Design a protein with these regions (language model features):
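N-terminal secretory/targeting leader peptides
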Residues: 1-185
Length: 185
């Protein structure tokens, strides 16, 4: 996201987590991107920022990475590799599920208890960011053949998955938003 914002003239800085709130409060930085409502509330970012912009255009969700040097990975036996793979998937799913469960109550708390004003980025801004993100990623990918191959797979998969997403998740969320009600328990 930072590389994309730079192309629009933003000055981006990478800070240690402990330095984000003080830098925001002092005006050393004008804005920050952290994780999501629950983590943002826990970090106290509302103490220094009264506006909260959605959606997060640069990352679809909170995801954990587990990076292991390929040469070291290949030295591990199959059982250890499987253990690491299964444990990594389980932790990632647990963290994703946790944040999905607590983000709405944190979002409401930011609004109702701390007076944070929620704003939605307009479609023309989202389109410009998305277009520029593609250009930045393409430029970075062009620097070496491995990156280019990975990027082409990502673009191909994105095209494919968007067809299914429009039929499945997007429609599911549309239906969930219909005004039907459930009887009280």
């Amino acid at each position: 996201g930072g590389e994309v914002l730079k192309t629009f003239g933003a000055n981006t800085v990478l800070l240690a987590g402990a330095d984000v709130l003080p830098s925001l409060a002092s005006g050393a930085i004008d804005a920050t991107e952290w994780i999501g409502p629950a983590a943002d509330l826990g970090k106290g970012l509302h103490q220094a920022a009264q506006y909260y912009y959605n959606p997060g255009w640069h990352e679809p969700a909170t995801i954990l990475d587990c990076s292991i040097d390929m040469f070291e990975w290949e030295k591990l036996d199959d059982a250890t590799r499987e253990l690491i793979t299964v444990a990594s998937k389980a932790v990632n799913m647990e963290v994703l599920s946790f944040f999905q469960a607590v983000n709405d109550s944190s979002y409401q708390k930011l609004i109702n208890e701390h007076g944070v004003q929620m704003r939605q980025l307009p479609d023309d801004v989202m389109n410009a960011l998305g277009q520029r993100a593609g250009e930045v990623c393409s430029s970075i990918a062009a620097e070496d053949p491995v990156s280019q191959e990975l990027f082409s797979h990502i673009v191909e998969f994105r095209s494919s998955i968007l067809r299914w997403t429009n039929t499945s998740e997007k429609e599911y969320m549309r239906v969930r938003s219909l005004p039907f009600t459930y009887p009280s328990a």
